[in-house]
Structures are given as C-alpha cells and as structure tokens.
Amino acid sequence: MSNINKTTQDVIVGDKTLSLETGWVAKQADGSVIARMGDTMVLATAVSDKVQKPGISDFVPLTVNYKERTYAAGKIPGGFFKRESRASKKETLASRIIDRSLRPLFPSGYTCETNVTAMVLSADGVYDTEVLAVMASSTALIISSIPFTTPVAAVRIGRLNGNFIVNPTLEEQKSCDMDLIISGSLEGMLMVEGGAKEVSEEDVIKALETAKPAIDILCKAQLELKEKAGKEKFSFQAETVPQDVVDLGNNKYRAEVANILNAFYDKQTRDVKIAELKAAFAEEIKEAHGDNASTFAGITMENLSYEESRKLVLEKGVRVDGRKTDEIRQLNSITGLLPRAHGSALFTRGQTQGLVVTTLGTSGDAQLVESLEESYDETFMLHYNFPGFSTGECKPDRAPGRREIGHGELARRALLPLIPDADKFPYTIRVVSDIMESNGSSSMASVCGGSLSLFDAGVPMKAACSGIAMGLIKEGDKYAVLSDIMGLEDHLGDMDFKLTGSRNGITAFQMDVKLAGGISIEILKEAVAQATKGRMHIMDHMDSVLPEPRKDVSKFAPVIYTMRIPQDKIGALIGPGGKNIKRITETTDTKIDINDDGVVQIAAVNGDKLAMAKAEIELLTAEVELNKIYKGKVVSIQPFGAFVELIPGKDGLLHISEIDKKRINKVEDVLKMGDIVEVKVVEIDNNGKVRLSRKVLL
C-alpha cells in the first residue's frame, strides 16, 4: 500500500462518513472512484469513446451496469455454474437508478459511446450499495475527461418510528414505513424511486426536503475531489441540422404541424399526418441534401412537434388530445373475463390497455431470491410484458428487458403493502400484466388492473390501489403539470412522475426529470397534490367495477391449509427416502411443502382431498398421550408380551400380565401377529418408552 498514490475526499452525511477514493484502482479508465461507507465498497468506472457517432441525435449512448460480486460478501454463487452470470433483478434495477440519475446531465448533442460500470467489491451487510453506486458513478464522470460537469448524488431516506433517517442501515430499512432513493444535483431533484406503507402526501414531501441538504453536501464533495484529481475535459462538436432546413421548417411547416396538433387527433391519425408532412418536407429538400434529407426532415419535424405541443399547453392550457392539464382519459374496466384464470381484469385508460391476470399457488411456487445480504422466498410476484403489437410495431419477442423489469417492479412495489400477510392468506401470488395497447402510463395500468385482478381472485387485500403518471412542461418560470400523460407527452415533456396508493396513502413513488437542473420542491408539491386528485378519480371508477375482493377464491385455485408439526417429527413425516410424503401426495392428489421450522402447507384440488392428507399427516406426526385409549396393531410377539403399534412409527409394550384379567401362560393364547387390539397408555417413562394395558379396559 505504500506505493499507492491515492486521493481521498471524506464527507459526513447524517451521522455516517462516506469516503471517495481515486488514483489507485482501474487507473486506465477515464475515471474511477471507490465510494466507501463502513466496510462496504463500490468501485465505479467511466470510459468513453472520444469520437462522436455520425449523424444527429439527442440520445446519449450511455450504458450503465451495476454488478454485485459474491466475493464481496464472502460467498460463492449458487447453482451449477459457480460464477456470476445473468444480471439479477436487483442489479438490473440498480443499473436503471444510476442511468436515470446520470442521463439528464450529459451535454446536449453528446453522442460519444460511454460506459459506466459500478461494481460492489465489499458488502458488510450494514450499508446500502445502491446509493454508493450512484455517488461513485457520478464522481468517476466528474473527475474524468468526459464532458460531464454537473455532479449528481443519491441518498436513501427512510422513516422509522416517525423520524426521517438519511441512509438508514439495511437492518433499519426493514422496519421503515417509507423507503425512497432520491438523486439530485445542486439545482434540484432528478430521480426518485421507492415505496411506502400508505403514507400521506405531506410525508413524501418531507422526505424529499430531508434529502436535499444531504444531496448538496455530497455534490460539493465531488467537486472538491475534482479540484484535487480531476482531468481536463475533452471537447466535442455536435452535428446540427443545416440552417436552410431549419428556416424552411419554421417558415412553411411549423403552421401545418400546429394545425395537426390543434386538431386533437388520436395517436394513430396524428402519427400518420405527421409522417405525411415529414415525407413532403424530405422530398422538398432532397435535391439540396440528398441522402440526409429524410434525417434532417425527421429531426426538424420532431423539434417542431416538441415546440408546438408545449406551446399549446403553456399558452392555451390544452393538450394535443384536447384534454385540460388535469383531465384523465376515458376509463373502462372488465373483471373475470378469463374463465379458467384465478383472477383477471382488463383495464383501459384512453389508448392504453392492460390485461392483468392473477394466479394463486403454494409456498413451493415462491421465487427464491439470493442477494449479497440474504436469501429469501418472494411470495408476491408481478411480471410486466410489453409486446410490439401494443404500439402497432412489428418486432421480435425477446426476453424481458430493463424497462419491463423496472415497470414490473414498480407495480409490484405499489401493490405489495396491501397484500395480506401469509398467516391470513397462505398463497403465493403471481400477477402478470400483458400490455394490449400502449399510449403512455402502461405501468400505472398494470397497477390499476393488478388491483382489480387481485380483487377478482378473492385476495383479501387491505385496500384497492390506483396509480397515475404525471408530466411537466416547463419553459423558464412558466410551467404546467399534466395529469395522466400519454406517450407523446412523456416523450416531449420534462418529467415522468408516477404515484400509486390506496385511499389511505401512498405506496409507491417514481420520478424521472429530463431538465439538467432538476425540478424544485415547490413544483413537486403541486404535482403530488394534482396526482392525488387524479388518482382518486381513477379509484372511484375502479370501485364502481369491483368495490371489494370476492368472498372466495376461484374454484380452479388450489385449496390450501397450513399446519405446524414438531420439528423432530419432520423426518417421520417424510419417511425413509421420502416414502411417507410420496405416498400421501399420491393417494390424496395433493402437494405438500414442509419447512425446516415445522410449518407444513397442504394444497389440494378440493376440501375432501385436503382433509385426507391432513389426517394422514396428523397420524404420522402425532405424539402418544398418557391415559389415552388406542386401537393398535400387534407388530411383535415376545415371551414377555407383545409390541403394539399405536401410531405410525411408535410402538408400546403390552406386558403379558396386562393382556387379560386372568393369568395366561403364553401371549399367543390371546393375541397373534396382525391383531387389532384396544389398549390404554398407562406409562411413558423419561426415555419415551410406552407401557400399555389391555386388561384395564376389560
């Protein structure tokens, strides 16, 4: 360590010290930083091509990967292949959090391929790795030669016993009723992701206000490290549309774009008319610009649509589909439409439609989740699918991408606080949201449809849950908050803010801001208030369709019963080589799951089959009771008496003197092998040996 040239910047946030280190690991990267808190260490590296991609684009070619090395927690990966492979759900979600925090801060027109990798090197099981990953990633970019100049920091805000905590420990997080990851710059908020247990709108705002001072401290620390170890930024030249094309667009085509947007067409009609206008534009400039004509026309039309749609909102308070800023699209819902599914709902909001289906399973159907900190069974799952046909696109079906995983997790987090506890409803629950149509807010359709589907399945939820996506149009000091945004408003707007919850409070919160300076707390307060109003309107609609969970689960769902047996009886229930449990499941047509703590779950196709399996289990795991009368089977005859099997695996001695009231010379005078005999337990000694009597019953 003596030859290492390390530069360090320490910063205290709350009561915890965070260290930023550079100059000693991954030195060939454009920027590399280790963020450390306690014994938790996250290395982030930033590498960029120095050449712009050809063409004009407003898309930043940024790739972010968050990786957890199992050695960080002193573990070896499970499974057949003993190495890390496909990204876990946590790694995917953490990658999205980092990406969403960084992307708005890259300069306009920057198209150099850029990779950011955050790698967990050490995990002490105390401190969170995700906020350290955001911090390390931003700092790696700040000190690098990459033209990324605005630091972004993230903190985790939890509320424990009514008190807000900055960066709670992993143990504290388990008891928090609110858990938000919030990132921002010195200017404002950029990204929020988290969940809560039906908290108020005011509580969420307080959490954001608690986060801002901590974010400012962390951003300043990055700038201080840059002063010590920063590199000179390389310059780039962004390509632009030729001025003659811009002028033609403004002078001839702007008015036509405005007319199309002011006609309040539906998505398909509007897209067709804009495409026709683009084709005419491209044809007009083809002679002057050749093969670039279509690209230049497309970019110009995109810019004109951006400007005119925003002007429509800010100047007239009207959106491109004719709605007011706080107006919700038309709602329509159906439940119980799939006869064999355990629960189903078709939720439609405008041109966005989700088919959401609930399936009930047993504890054996739970998803095993393994992380650096712990392993556990996930008994509530929500999977989101976004096929190409939902937007009229012809594209191949592939495995779920980051977007699908992220949307599914948001919807799962929204519904999770309202799912009943396992002791009240012992089913594993899987909800699948298949998006049938999409024109914005499909994740919120998954939440609303998911709630209705769970109600239809007879899941006794604590309350119904609705969700809404909000947008923002901001030019200077003038702005408008939009309720229930559609696809165009998401694409051309400055914010995508999603809020979910019951009538009692908020359960999930997600926000992404495209403005480099973020947005203020004041705008967020207005957005939250407007979102709550819209969410209650949607909730009223849902209540009109299915106001409460159905009283019973589907007749096609398994019948489940949970019981507990002594842990020392688990072996007796399973039997040698699984003989006993296999016999029970086959003869009763049931599925039986046995936990190490003695909890046994029986799933059957009907109540009769379940009762048969339950009786078999009780028989195999019962304890012999003193003074109780049993009908047992003679399994062994000895000169001194007979051994009688009282319950499976448990015999008692019936001494020759206890067989009959009169004296007998041989046991065989009264009993023979296989006889069923009624006996009473008269003694159980300290070693568990059982003595029986027949004569006391004669």
Swiss-Prot record:
Superkingdom in the source lineage: Bacteria
Signal peptide: none
Localisation: Cytoplasm
GO biological processes: mRNA catabolic process; RNA processing
Any one GO MF annotation of this record: magnesium ion binding
Keywords: Cytoplasm, Magnesium, Metal-binding, Nucleotidyltransferase, RNA-binding, Transferase
UniProt cofactor(s): Mg(2+)
Residues covered by the KH domain: 558-617
Catalytic activity: RNA(n+1) + phosphate = RNA(n) + a ribonucleoside 5'-diphosphate
Pfam families reported for this sequence: KH_1 (PF00013), PNPase (PF03726), RNase_PH (PF01138), RNase_PH_C (PF03725), S1 (PF00575)
InterPro entries hit by this protein: ExoRNase_PH_dom1 (IPR001247), ExoRNase_PH_dom2 (IPR015847), ExoRNase_PH_dom2_sf (IPR036345), KH_dom (IPR004087), KH_dom_type_1 (IPR004088), KH_dom_type_1_sf (IPR036612), NA-bd_OB-fold (IPR012340), PNPase (IPR012162)
Gene Ontology annotations for the cellular component aspect, listed alphabetically: cytosol
EC numbers on record: 2.7.7.8
Residues that, per the record, bind Mg(2+): D490, D496
Domain S1 motif, chain residue ranges per copy: 627-695
Similarity annotation: Belongs to the polyribonucleotide nucleotidyltransferase family.
Function: Involved in mRNA degradation. Catalyzes the phosphorolysis of single-stranded polyribonucleotides processively in the 3'- to 5'-direction.
Protein's name in the database: Polyribonucleotide nucleotidyltransferase
Organism: Elusimicrobium minutum (strain Pei191)
Gene designation: pnp
